[in-house]
Amino acid sequence: MPHLIAVIQARTGSTRLPRKVLRELGGRPVLEWVVTAARESNVCDAIVVATTTEPGDGAVVDLAARLGVAAVRGPVDDVLTRFLMAADAAHAVSGDAVVRLTADCPLLDPMVIAECAAVFDPARTDYVTTDHEHTVAHGFDVEIVSVDALHAIDPVATGADRAHVTPYITLHPDDFRIASVALDPPSADLRVTLDEPADAELLDAIVAELGDRATSRRDVVALLRARPDLVALNAHVAVKPLAAG
């Protein structure tokens, strides 16, 4: 069986909501929610936080230590390099894979991570994603990419492909074996990530309704379908383009 390494990209230098990954949600830092989701998936053999060398991100390293997980520090905009550093820190070898998680998605469902892990097979897949058909809310996304694929794209990926790690793979489907995990019910019209103050308002409201522990994606979607007033809180927030980094 391949080793699965959860790599959580996190930094404090967000332009729209600075220090968002350290923000309290239900009494816990947002980053802690993501670490908890990775742990409760019961499929991750290691968890590594991939942050930057910026001075302010020392706070991310300190929080990772308090949570009992490793951290690596690398270039701000070259997230691919940070992921390779994280894989090395976890002693990844050929056949192992990285579960790509972002620290601004505190409502990640551990079961979705487990579903993706069940699909990943190094003999048949290089990349597993929940978002290949664009049916999942921004904030529930999970990706698994083989360490071999990361090393393969490292010499050729540039710009946004390095900042966002996996676009090169999806743009070259003839070169990589891609599998998609469909998540029902569809939720692409919803947004449960944390980029702006309006997102924080929605996440606070969801946690107030559902509790301060990890909840299932289905419970979150059901709540938002029943409460259009909550959906309206961040419906105006635009998705940041890939080129923005």
Q: Across the structure, where does each feature detected by a protein language model lie?
A:
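Conserved nucleotide-sugar donor-binding
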Residues: 142-152, 197-200
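Basic phosphate/pyrophosphate-binding loop/patch that engages nucleotide-derived ligands
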Residues: 115-126, 146-161, 171
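N-terminal nucleotide-binding beta1-loop-alpha1 segment
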Residues: 1-17
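Conserved donor-nucleotide/metal-binding helix-loop-beta segment in metal-dependent transferases, i.e.
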Residues: 85-90, 107-135
